[in-house]
Amino acid sequence: MYMKKPAIPDDVIERVQQGKCTKEDALLLLEGNPFELFELANKLRASTVGDVVSYVVNRNIYITNKCVGTCGFCAYRTDEGYILSIEEILKQTEEAREAGAVEVCVQGGYTPEADMEFYLEIIEAIKSGFPDICIHALSPMEVNYAAGLSGMSVEDALRKLKKCGLDSLTGTSAEILSDRVRKIICPGKITTQQWVDTVTAAHRAGISTNSTIMYGHVETLEERLDHVFTIREIQKETGGISELIPMSFLPYNNPIGEKMMASGKFTSTGLEDLQLIAISRIILHTHVNNIQATWVKLGKKLAQFALQCGANDLGGTLMEDQISTASGGSYGEYVSPAEFEWMIKGAGRVPIQRDTLYRKVEPRLPASEGLLPGYVKPKMGSKE
């Protein structure tokens, strides 16, 4: 027999509305009726950003798949891979610009060939050639590794990146901000405190960041929540975080996922995905305004439904996503502006295009134009 769960207590709602949700509140909300959780998150979304849903016309540029990391969730890295030349990077940026992009997201593995001078040259070349393109690049891990190779401090590296034209640092390499979890899934990566220190140093240097959480593997529910509360604490200190992107773990073609599936455990369910989006909106209310439902992880239909659960952004056109595809992602690598508009309007919302920093931009091309799904990806870069 179905037992109706009690309504959300008034004192919890009051704390949430004040931006003071506690961990105990969050656990209580997750134990309750999920549809009441979604409704609360949706109301907070409406009061914060209204009925506007944003997306960005962008392109991922994967500069290298070489990596000395030992992350157990990664199927992307190879010992013998490619490194794009400056010319290849600029060519891909030009293709993106011609397709109406306002952002390039530059990412890859970390490798001894890529010191800080390597990244500074890339950032400067892109900004010089395409000053109207936002450069969203490097992770806190890459900054730490490359700065170490070049014998400079993280703070100096960030100042140089800012001077060369970096607009935003990616909030990836966060995974789960728990050292217990990190020792299992990415033992060679920076610690939780190093990640926090790098992000706050970026904000002090005038560089915005987003934030991410990669969940659905070995972490506990409380560790997920602790992660989101850590993001809140950073934001209270610096105000430099533009968004949170919850990313569900893809368990295919990687050691962590294979071990999970062999034991009968799979990644997060659709309900868990929506609950995390909702509770993130609730915890971060009055602090981080933007919660993304990333279609490349959730699929287009679940991402659209997440707009009823606290999300207000659908991410980017991407044009390619080698990392998700390598780990079994099956939702494609490109969504056209026209399809984003259709998804958003179908949810009863108002679509807008934005840039990296969540500033509204006028479309550079009509939504019906630009790069179409028949787009042929360029070949990978030159072998080293």
UniProtKB/Swiss-Prot annotation:
Matching InterPro entries: Aldolase_TIM, CofH/MnqC-like_C, CofH_family, Elp3/MiaA/NifB-like_rSAM, F420, FO_synthase_su2, Pept_M12B_GON-ADAMTSs, rSAM
E.C. designation(s): 2.5.1.147
Please name the SUPFAM superfamilies in this protein's record.
Radical SAM enzymes
* Signal peptide feature range: none
Q: Which residues bind [4Fe-4S] cluster?
A: C67, C71, C74
Give the protein's function.
Catalyzes the radical-mediated synthesis of 5-amino-5-(4-hydroxybenzyl)-6-(D-ribitylimino)-5,6-dihydrouracil from 5-amino-6-(D-ribitylamino)uracil and L-tyrosine.
The name on file for this protein is 5-amino-6-(D-ribitylamino)uracil--L-tyrosine 4-hydroxyphenyl transferase 2
Q: Please give the pathway this protein is involved in.
A: Cofactor biosynthesis; coenzyme F0 biosynthesis
- Write one Gene Ontology MF term: 4 iron, 4 sulfur cluster binding
Cofactor binding annotation? Binds 1 [4Fe-4S] cluster. The cluster is coordinated with 3 cysteines and an exchangeable S-adenosyl-L-methionine.
Family recorded in the similarity comment = Belongs to the radical SAM superfamily. CofH family.
Cofactor(s) the protein requires to work? [4Fe-4S] cluster
| UniProt keyword annotations, A-Z | 4Fe-4S, Iron, Iron-sulfur, Metal-binding, S-adenosyl-L-methionine, Transferase
- Where would I find the Radical SAM core domain in this sequence? 53-286
Q: How does it assemble?
A: Consists of two subunits, CofG and CofH.
**Which reaction does this chain catalyze?**
5-amino-6-(D-ribitylamino)uracil + L-tyrosine + S-adenosyl-L-methionine = 5-amino-5-(4-hydroxybenzyl)-6-(D-ribitylimino)-5,6-dihydrouracil + 2-iminoacetate + 5'-deoxyadenosine + L-methionine + H(+)
Q: What class of enzyme is it?
A: transferase
